[in-house]
Curated annotation (Swiss-Prot):
Family annotation (SUPFAM superfamilies): Thioesterase/thiol ester dehydrase-isomerase
EC number(s) recorded for this UniProt protein: 4.2.1.59
GO molecular function, one term: (3R)-hydroxyacyl-[acyl-carrier-protein] dehydratase activity
Xref: CDD domains: FabZ
The entry's keywords: Cytoplasm, Lipid A biosynthesis, Lipid biosynthesis, Lipid metabolism, Lyase
Reported function: Involved in unsaturated fatty acids biosynthesis. Catalyzes the dehydration of short chain beta-hydroxyacyl-ACPs and long chain saturated and unsaturated beta-hydroxyacyl-ACPs.
Main location: cytoplasm
Pfam families, per database record: FabA (PF07977)
Protein origin, superkingdom: Bacteria
Subcellular location: Cytoplasm
Lineage, highest ranks first: Bacteria, Pseudomonadati, Pseudomonadota, Gammaproteobacteria, Candidatus Pseudothioglobaceae
Organism of provenance: Ruthia magnifica subsp. Calyptogena magnifica
Residues the record marks as active site: 47
GO cellular component: cytoplasm; membrane
Protein's name in the database: 3-hydroxyacyl-[acyl-carrier-protein] dehydratase FabZ
Amino acid sequence: MSIQDVKNYLPHRYPFLLIDRVLELEIGKSIVALKNVTFNEPQFTGHFPEQPIMPGVMIVEALAQATGILAFKSEAGKPIDGQIYMLVGIDKVRFKRMVEPGDQLRLEVEVITIKRGIWKFKCKATVDNQIITSAELMCTQRTAG
């Protein structure tokens, strides 16, 4: 899935669109996406100027955006249909390594459960096959606006 396709499934735009490409997607089960980290991103002007590292919350947000694409594709919807997926919970977050400009984040998400409209996902972000961040995320669908 190209960036143009990604933009059809996420309402986010620059500088907060954190998915560059989807490599794999299995409806209702899993997604693998990429985020290319570059020095030109605005967070690096303050985090930290002498040693730029991607904030952990931005890594979690990238994972959350991957969950949104998976949920939209699984439910055959899009944000233009008046619906959005909102992050409603984060559990078991661990940060193991730093992410620096030039890294490519591989975002891997699997559906754990779907109960009463709440999706629960097992997520991990890796760089060069090393785990950077792991977490369980929850999201639900809401009407936009």
